[in-house]
């Protein structure tokens, strides 16, 4: 008897769904190309990907972006490849789960934006505090998220993983190679 595939393979397209802590759907990305999967990591690429907001508004991403998700870290990383360099949008979020429908995670509002010149900004602190009170984030969740902000800032400072230009070059090149095969 043939073994059932364990999830998406390199070159497959998946949907990504982010939810809020209360379980409501926040945002959906259609057709993210999978570049790599391992036990704990999924790397993909969005390129002119359709995004649907919770209110039904739709828009298309403007540039290619390498996306990084991990099953143990409470953040995911979007590296947007632009003419003036790579910009990063890092979501503080639950580790992802992957099922037949989509890659899914809970978005916890806090974001770190990194500009091509290295400037960093922590965004949406007010939204995090508002939702934390509204949905009663536990003390453990708050502690874990704040600890993961520190991990994320350390990765940024040390150009670890997605924050390395070599990493971006390797995975964007792989995306281009797989796109030519489609």
Swiss-Prot record:
Family annotation (SUPFAM superfamilies): FomD-like (SSF159234)
Keyword Hydrolase in annotation: yes
Class in the EC hierarchy, top level: hydrolase
Binding locations of Mg(2+) 2: 109, 111, 124, 127
Entry keyword set: Hydrolase, Magnesium, Metal-binding
Catalytic center residues: 27 (proton donor)
Cofactor: Mg(2+)
Catalytic activity reported: a ribonucleoside 5'-triphosphate + H2O = a ribonucleoside 5'-diphosphate + phosphate + H(+); a ribonucleoside 5'-diphosphate + H2O = a ribonucleoside 5'-phosphate + phosphate + H(+)
Protein name: Nucleoside triphosphate/diphosphate phosphatase
Organism (species): Lactiplantibacillus plantarum (strain ATCC BAA-793 / NCIMB 8826 / WCFS1)
């Amino acid at each position: 008897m043939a073994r059932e595939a364990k999830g998406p393979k390199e070159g497959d397209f998946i949907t990504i769904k982010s939810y809020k802590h209360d379980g409501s759907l926040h945002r959906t990305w259609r057709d993210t190309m999978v570049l790599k999967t391992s036990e704990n990591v999924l790397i993909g690429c969005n390129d002119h990907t359709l995004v649907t907001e919770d209110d039904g508004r739709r828009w298309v991403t403007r540039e290619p972006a390498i996306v990084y998700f991990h099953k143990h870290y409470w953040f995911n990383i979007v590296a947007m490849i632009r003419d003036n360099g790579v910009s990063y949008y890092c979501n503080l979020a639950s580790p992802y789960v992957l099922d037949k429908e989509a890659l899914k995670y809970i978005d916890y509002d806090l974001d770190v934006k990194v500009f091509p010149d290295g400037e960093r900004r922590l965004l949406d602190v007010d939204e995090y505090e508002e939702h934390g009170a509204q949905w009663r984030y536990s003390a453990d969740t708050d502690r874990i998220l704040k600890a993961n902000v520190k991990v994320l800032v350390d990765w940024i400072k040390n150009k670890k993983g997605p924050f390395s230009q070599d990493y971006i070059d390797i995975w964007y090149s792989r995306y281009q190679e797989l796109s030519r095969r489609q």
